[in-house]
Design a protein with these regions (language model features):
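Transmembrane-helix boundary motif in ABC transporter permease subunits
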Residues: 2-6, 72-104, 116, 120, ...
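C-terminal transmembrane helix and the adjacent membrane-cytosol boundary/short C-terminal tail
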Residues: 4, 13-14, 36, 88, ...
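Short membrane-interfacial helix/loop motifs at transmembrane-helix boundaries
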Residues: 20-57, 61, 121, 125, ...
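Membrane-cytosol interface at the C-terminal ends of specific transmembrane alpha-helices
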Residues: 140-182, 208
Length: 282
C-alpha cells in the first residue's frame, strides 16, 4: 500500500515540472492575451478591438485573404501528398526510391533560407527568367508579392509533412486487399475511393488539421513574399504589435487566430472520438 502511494507521488512529481512549464509558457500568456484583447488603450474593458477587427474593411480583407490562402494551401497539400504517398507506396523503381529519400529535404532547411532561395528562383529577374533567356524566351513568373507565391512556398513546407502522415497510413494497408480489389475488376479510381481513402481518412484529417493550424499564423513567408495589402493575420499582428505598438488590437488578432485553430482542433477531436465510438459499438 505504501509503495503504491510512493509511486503515485513520484509520478505526480515527474509530471509537475511539465505542467508548470505549460502553465507559465502557454496558459498564462493565453489568459493575458484574452484579457488584453478586451481592453481599450485607456485600460477600460470593452469590445472595441473586436468591433474594429470585424468592421474595419482592411481587417476583414486580411481575414478573408488569410483564410483563402490557408484553405487553398490545405487542399493542394493533401492532393499532392496523396499523389506522392501513393506513388511511393505502389511504384517500385530506382526513381521512386530516390524520391522517397529526397522528399524530406525541405523539412531540414531553415524556413527563412528556403524562402529566400525560392525568391531567387521565382523573382521576375530570378533563376527561371535567366535560364529561359538563354533560349531567347522572356518569361516573368510574376509570383512575387502575390497569393500564388505564398501558396507555392507553403506547399514546399507542408507537402513533406502531409506525405509522411499519409504514407504511414498507406503502409498499413495490406497488399492482399489491393490485389483482391484488382482481381474483381476494380479500377484505380474505385480502389482509391472505396479502399485507400476510407482507410487513410483519419491520417488525412491529422494532416489537414496541422497544416491548417500551422499556416493560419504563419509569418516568415507572407512577410517576405506577400503584398502590402491585404496581408495575412500573422503579419497584421506583427504590425499592430511592433510597428504601431497597439497591444490591444494585436491581442485581439492573436485571440481570433487562437479561436480559429481551436475550432479546427475541436473538429478533429470530435471526428476521432466519433469514429472511436462507432468502433466500440461495432
Amino acid at each position: 500500500m505504501k509503495k503504491n502511494i510512493v509511486n503515485k507521488f513520484i509520478g505526480i512529481g515527474l509530471v509537475l515540472p511539465s505542467i508548470f512549464i505549460i502553465i507559465v509558457v502557454i496558459t498564462i500568456p493565453i489568459i493575458q492575451s484574452v484579457l488584453l484583447s478586451f481592453q481599450s488603450k485607456d485600460g477600460k474593458y470593452s469590445l472595441e478591438n473586436y468591433v474594429h477587427l470585424f468592421s474595419d474593411r482592411s481587417s476583414v480583407n486580411n481575414i478573408i485573404y488569410t483564410l483563402n490562402i490557408v484553405i487553398i494551401t490545405v487542399i493542394f497539400t493533401i492532393i499532392f501528398a496523396y499523389l506522392m504517398a501513393m506513388y511511393l507506396r505502389f511504384c517500385k523503381s530506382w526513381f521512386s526510391n530516390a524520391i522517397g529519400k529526397l522528399y524530406l529535404i525541405p523539412k531540414f532547411i531553415p524556413g527563412i533560407v528556403a524562402v529566400y532561395a525560392m525568391m531567387g528562383v521565382i523573382n521576375d529577374a530570378g533563376a527561371i527568367n535567366r535560364l529561359l533567356l538563354i533560349f531567347g524566351i522572356h518569361f516573368k513568373p510574376s509570383l512575387m508579392y502575390t497569393p500564388q507565391g505564398i501558396i507555392l512556398m507553403n506547399l514546399w513546407f507542408n507537402i513533406p509533412f502531409a506525405t509522411i502522415i499519409i504514407s504511414a497510413a498507406l503502409s498499413s494497408i495490406p497488399n492482399s486487399i489491393i490485389e483482391s480489389a484488382r482481381d474483381v475488376g476494380a479500377s484505380k479510381v474505385e480502389i482509391f475511393r472505396r479502399i485507400i481513402l476510407p482507410l487513410t481518412a483519419k491520417s488525412a484529417l491529422v494532416a489537414i488539421t496541422f497544416v491548417f493550424m500551422s499556416n493560419v499564423g504563419s509569418f516568415t513567408t507572407p512577410f517576405l513574399m506577400g503584398s502590402n495589402s491585404p496581408i495575412m493575420l500573422g503579419v497584421s499582428l506583427y504590425q499592430e504589435f511592433g510597428a504601431f505598438y497597439n497591444l490591444q488590437k494585436a491581442a485581439a488578432i492573436s485571440v481570433f487566430m487562437f479561436i480559429i485553430c481551436s475550432i479546427v482542433g475541436a473538429f478533429y477531436i470530435y471526428s476521432i472520438m466519433k469514429e472511436d465510438k462507432w468502433n466500440i459499438q461495432e
